[in-house]
């Protein structure tokens, strides 16, 4: 897996950050998956550059005044990809593991997320301060056994259908 991540990083570095809206969103998702939230945020900020509706350019991305992704013609991939990248920076789920703040940018040292859905329709609500998780609330409509990773800690939990798991950290 490390070899694949290293190869992905090298490919992203060589290709650079320029591209259309959907392409920048995709690259932001990949940088977040690699754990580099600062680079992912740079791409998202580039995607939020306002562009003129009458301008037709195949490079540079940006958004139209109505907040739709600029890529002649408009493609929803950029908007959905932008949201996916933000979530990928805040929480990742893989093989029954939920990782909180895996790629948190330095600029987002305090915050919260509510209503994030993980596979199995598990609802995640969490807060952080100074880049450390301070509260976790999980709710599942089904029985679930999973591992949560936060603040360098790993914890195995069991969720019973309809019940909540809550943790407050100091």
Residue ranges and their predicted role:
Residues 52-56, 111, 151:
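Short alpha-helical interface elements
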Residues 73-124:
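Catalytic cores of secreted or luminal carbohydrate-active enzymes
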């Amino acid at each position: 897996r490390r070899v694949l991540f290293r190869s992905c990083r090298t490919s992203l570095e060589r290709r650079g950050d320029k591209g259309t809206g959907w392409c920048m969103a995709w690259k932001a998702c990949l940088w977040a998956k690699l754990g580099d939230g600062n680079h992912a945020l740079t791409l998202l900020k580039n995607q939020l550059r306002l562009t003129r509706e009458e301008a037709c350019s195949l490079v540079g991305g940006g958004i139209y005044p109505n907040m739709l992704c600029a890529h002649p013609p408009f493609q929803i991939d950029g908007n959905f990809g932008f949201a996916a990248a933000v979530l990928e920076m805040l929480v990742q789920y893989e093989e029954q593991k939920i990782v909180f703040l895996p790629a948190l940018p330095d600029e987002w040292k305090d915050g919260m997320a509510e209503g994030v859905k993980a596979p199995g329709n598990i609802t995640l609500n969490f807060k952080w301060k100074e880049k450390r998780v301070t509260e976790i609330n999980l709710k599942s409509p089904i029985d679930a056994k999973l591992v949560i990773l936060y603040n360098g800690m790993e914890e195995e939990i069991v969720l019973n259908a309809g019940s909540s798991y809550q943790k407050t950290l100091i």
